[in-house]
Amino acid sequence: MPASRIISLQASPDDLPPMLRRNQRRPWSEQQTAEQGLPEPAAPETLSWKRHLLRLLVAACALMAEGGAWSDQPQEIKIGYLRQAPSKIRISLIDVPAGNDGLAGAHLATEDDNATGRFLNQHYAVVEKLLGEGDDAVAAMNALADQGASFIVTSLDADRLLQVADAGRTRSVTLINALALDERLREQDCRANVIHVAPTRAMLADALAQYLVWKKWTKWMLLTGSHDNDALFADALRHAATRFGAKIVEQREFKDNGGARRTDSGVAEIQRQMPVVTQGAPEHDVLVAADESEVFAGYLPYRTWDARPVAGSAGLVPTTWNAAFDQWGAVQLQNRFTKAYQRPMTAHDMQVWTAVRMIGEAGARGGSAEPGKMLAYMKSPEFSVAAFKGQKLTLRDWNLQLRQPILLFDGRNTVSVSPQEGFLHQVSALDTLGLDRPETKCRLK
C-alpha cells in the first residue's frame, strides 16, 4: 500500500460516514443498565475486539472515499507452514495427535486474519509442507519461499529449525517456532529471523513451580526419564525449584527398558512397578515427573507408594492450552474449532493459531503488507496479539520469545493460570516465567 494511502486506525465513530454513523448506539452507562433493566455490557475483551473492527472499517471507508483506493485484486499474503510428522507414541490413546494437529490451528487463524484483512484489501492463505522422517527441511523451506511465503510457521525439532533458519537468511524468510521448547534456541543458538510462540521448558517449569510454592508444597521428589529431552525438562524443574524456594529432597531416574505395556498383562505389571519405583522416598509434598518421552509419568497418578499428588509430565501439567479452558472468551474459540474439525483444540493447535494471528495482526495494524515492514512492526514495542489469555501477549526483545500465561491442567480442568499472585517483576509479571533479560545468553544475529 503506498505511503500516501495509509490511514490511521486510531479513529472514533465520529469519523464514520453519516450513513454508518446513524447506526452507532450511544455508550452504555451504569444508570441505563440499572434503571431500564438492560443487559450488562459486553466483556472488555469483546468490546476491544469490536473497537478493533470499527477502526479497520473506518480505515476502509476512508480509503474508498478517496476514490479508487482499492485495487480489484486484494494483496495476497502467503503464510508457510512447515511441519514434521508428529510421534504417535503416547501412553494414553486419547492423547495420540490427529493428522491435522497444528494445521487445523493454522487454517482457523487464517479465517480470523481474513475477517479483518478484508477491510484492508488483504487476503491471507496458508501453504503447507509436511516432512517425512528423512525429508530435507531446507528444500521444503525453499519450496514455500518459492510460493511467496516470507513468513513460515514451523513445527520442527530444534536441529531442523536451526538448519532452516540459517538457510532462510538468503531468502529473507522469517520463521515462527510453534513447537520446539529448547532453551538453546532462545539462548546461545538464538537467531534474529526466528520468533518463538512455543514456550520454553523453563517457562513451563516456572509456571508449575510458582503454583506449587503458592500451595506451600515445597518439598519435591523428582523422577526423571532416561532420554535427552527428559533430562532437559528435569534441568528446568531443578532451576525453577531453586528460583522460587522449593527443595528437591530426592532425585531418581526411570530407565526406559522398553516392554509391551499394552499386552494383556500390562496393567497388572504397571500396578506392581510404579509403587516400587517410588518406594522409600524421603518425606515430600509432591512427586514431580520429567518424562517428555511418554514412558512412565502417565502411570504415576494413583500408583505411587505414598499418597502424593503428581505434577510435571503427568497429573498437574503446565501447558499453553487445553480443551477445557473457557476463560476470557476462550469458549468461543473452542466451540469454533470443535465445530470445524470435530475434535478438541490442542496446545499445538493453539500455538500455531497464535503464530498465524501474529502475522495477521502485523499486516492489519502495521499499515503495510510488505514483509519487511510487517516484521519491523512485529518486533516493535507497539506490537501485541490477543490470544484469549486475559492480557495482550508481547515479544521479549532480547530473544524474540512470546510472553504468555501458562495454564496448569489436571486432565479435565484448568486448575490455575501462572504467573501466580505475589510473584512480581519490574517490567511484566510474565517475565517471571522463563529466563529473564539479565540471565540471557542470546545475541540476536
Predicted regions and their residues:
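Extracytosolic ligand-binding ectodomains
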Residues: 2-7, 15, 23, 48, ...
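Residue-identity detector for glycine
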Residues: 37, 67-68
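Bacterial N-terminal signal peptides that target proteins for export
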Residues: 45-56
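Bacterial N-terminal signal peptides
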Residues: 55-65
